[in-house]
């Protein structure tokens, strides 16, 4: 079979992924951090090792790595929390996933936020000067950028955009679902407040993390 949907989910996985999942379910599957017995301790070691590996890969503090069932859930938790805390001027890229746009549309229809797309030129490249003009006119509370589009493949100049956003004291959220482990990005820098990615795409892992 020829498989061409890797931008949605990579397949097949490396053999070690299948073996590790089988090993975990048969011999580890305890509740992480909720018991003082062998299975629970083994699960904690796996989680701690995974955090350390992600720290090496993405240059982020291991203790700031949080696991959720999906990138969609992670994005929703972050966006809802920030809006509930009072953020109203939300800027997004023109290439956001439905996990972002539908959540923001929900709040916008409730009168709890205004959503504006960051400016791109006719070649679909970000226009930093025009984005600065946008921020000058309406100060951002939250700037959300998809690191790469899984439709057209455009990689956003995220450091430029987020550095500009920080001049206006905005929170920043990077959707790395398409790029984690594939495109180098130092999310340990102060310009990154939140970064979300999935295990089942470019990290070649299973779904559900």
Predicted stretch roles:
Residues 1-209:
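Pyridoxal 5′-phosphate
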């Amino acid at each position: 079979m020829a498989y061409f949907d890797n931008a949605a989910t990579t397949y097949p996985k490396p053999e070690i992924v299948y073996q590790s999942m089988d090993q975990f379910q048969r011999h580890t599957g305890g509740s992480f951090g909720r018991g003082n017995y062998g299975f629970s301790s083994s699960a904690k070691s796996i989680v701690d090792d995974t955090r350390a590996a992600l720290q090496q890969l993405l240059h982020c503090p291991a203790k700031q790595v949080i696991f959720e069932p999906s990138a969609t859930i992670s994005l929703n938790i972050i966006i809802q929390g920030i809006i509930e805390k009072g953020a109203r001027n939300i800027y997004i890229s023109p290439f956001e996933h439905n996990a972002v746009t539908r959540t923001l549309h929900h709040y916008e229809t409730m009168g709890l936020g205004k959503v504006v797309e960051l400016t791109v030129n006719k070649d679909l490249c970000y226009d930093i000067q025009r984005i600065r003009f946008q921020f000058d006119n309406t100060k951002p509370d939250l700037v959300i950028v998809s690191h790469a589009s899984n439709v057209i493949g455009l990689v956003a100049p995220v450091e430029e955009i987020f550095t500009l956003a920080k001049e206006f004291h905005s929170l920043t959220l990077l959707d790395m679902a398409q790029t984690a482990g594939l495109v180098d990005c130092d999310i340990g820098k102060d310009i990154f407040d939140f970064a979300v990615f999935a295990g089942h795409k470019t990290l070649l892992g299973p779904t559900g993390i």
